[in-house]
């Protein structure tokens, strides 16, 4: 172990951002009109040797918001049936789901001494656009742990 890795933390490795891998499943491409149906978040942590490892995953099955568009082709692609009784038994409303996820991420973020989370994903701005629309719909801006526009995108 070098002196560099001994003092390296996830906070100073990523400029005080905690990387969180995010994946969403949606009912279309428009974050303002189409439902966000599922979200999963996995914080990326770092051990004392400077190796990255996944933190505990947190996820939610989300009930479509009132008036949400459910594109048939998107549902066929994802295989999600938002009207399935089994899914309805575990699905949460948007506000409950996102605030539960943010509460967990806040705890992890604070334990790593990071100031914000940064969304990591494949085509990350797509996921972030749905997350930001959900934040706006649920008036959860003050609870959000994510940077509003910066991402780490695995496509690029």
Predicted regions and their residues:
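Conserved non-catalytic scaffold segment of RNase H-like nuclease domains
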Residues: 2-125
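Short alpha-helix plus adjacent loop in nuclease-associated cores
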Residues: 151-156
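Residue-level recognition of the N-termini of beta-strands and the immediately preceding loop/turn
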Residues: 115-118, 146-150
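Substrate-recognition/cap helix-loop segment adjacent to the acidic, metal-dependent catalytic center
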Residues: 109, 126-149
């Amino acid at each position: 172990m070098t002196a560099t890795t001994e003092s390296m933390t996830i906070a100073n490795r990523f400029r005080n951002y905690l990387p969180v891998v995010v994946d969403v499943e949606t009912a279309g491409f428009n974050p303002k009109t189409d439902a966000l149906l599922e979200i999963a978040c996995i914080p990326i942590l770092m051990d004392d040797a400077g190796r990255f490892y996944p933190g505990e995953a947190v996820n939610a099955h989300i009930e479509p918001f009132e008036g949400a568009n459910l594109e048939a082709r998107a549902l066929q692609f994802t295989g999600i049936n938002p009207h399935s009784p089994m899914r309805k038994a575990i699905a949460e409303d948007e506000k409950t789901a996102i605030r539960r996820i943010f509460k967990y991420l806040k705890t992890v973020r604070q334990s790593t001494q990071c100031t914000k989370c940064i969304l990591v994903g494949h085509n990350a701005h797509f996921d972030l656009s749905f997350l930001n629309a959900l934040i706006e719909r649920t008036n959860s801006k003050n609870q959000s742990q994510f940077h509003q526009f910066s991402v780490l995108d695995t496509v690029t």
